[in-house]
Regions:
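A conserved helix-loop-beta module that forms one wall/lid of the active-site cleft
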Residues: 32-43
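Active-site core segments that coordinate phosphate-bearing ligands/cofactors
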Residues: 1-5, 9, 13-32, 53-189
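Glycine-rich phosphate-binding loops at beta-strand->alpha-helix junctions
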Residues: 43-51, 71
């Protein structure tokens, strides 16, 4: 097969000019990295090739089945949810959580509180702030603090009885470092 990548996923390497959608050769050289290891880039929807012989045997897929580049997880989620135009924002709460908004041109936050990524819509970008610990904090609470084996639905029902604002309780979900509004792998709440 041919090795390649697409712009939304390549945005996370810090070696991509997100604005111009090409590898920053000068940055790559300054970092002392080999220039020939960076794959050709394509749009998410473009055909990367077809199913390899070995994969066809293992899966039963035809060798004529085309393989598409795809997208990074957040870009795919935004596209799948129809978040493809400026003015539309999405909130994703999974193990980690993100808030993302589509923009017409890249935005750069010098304090690195937000990140800019290439969107699957070729002439768009998205800005995103994410926390490493979203829904995963519920598992931590259940196991470490409550030591409770009841189903989450029971805990949800109980939590719904608490007043809005939880009587001033503030939880900072830094259980495994943090990404935004600041990057700190050692942050703890």
């Amino acid at each position: 097969g041919t090795i390649g990548s697409e712009y939304s996923d390549a945005s996370s390497t810090l070696a991509l000019s997100v604005r111009n959608r090409y590898w920053c050769r000068e940055l790559i050289r300054r970092a002392g990295l080999k220039e020939d290891i960076w794959p050709a880039l394509s749009e998410s929807w473009q055909v990367a090739g077809s199913v390899q012989e070995s994969a066809a045997r293992e899966t039963g897929l035809s060798r004529k089945t085309r393989v598409i580049f795809g997208a990074g997880d957040s870009a795919a989620q935004l596209t799948g949810n129809g978040v493809i135009e400026p003015g539309v924002t999405a909130c994703n709460i999974g193990t980690a959580s993100q808030i993302a908004a589509v923009v017409d041109s890249p935005l750069y936050d010098r304090q690195m509180r937000l990140q800019t990524w290439c969107h699957t819509a070729g002439d768009k970008w998205y800005i995103q702030g994410g926390t490493l610990n979203g829904g995963s904090t519920l598992g931590w609470l259940k196991k470490k603090i409550l030591k409770d084996s009841r189903p989450y639905s029971d805990l949800d029902r109980e939590a719904s009885l608490a007043p809005a604002g939880s009587e001033g309780l503030l939880f900072i979900p830094f259980l495994a470092g943090e990404r935004t509004p600041f990057m700190d792998p050692y942050a703890r709440g």
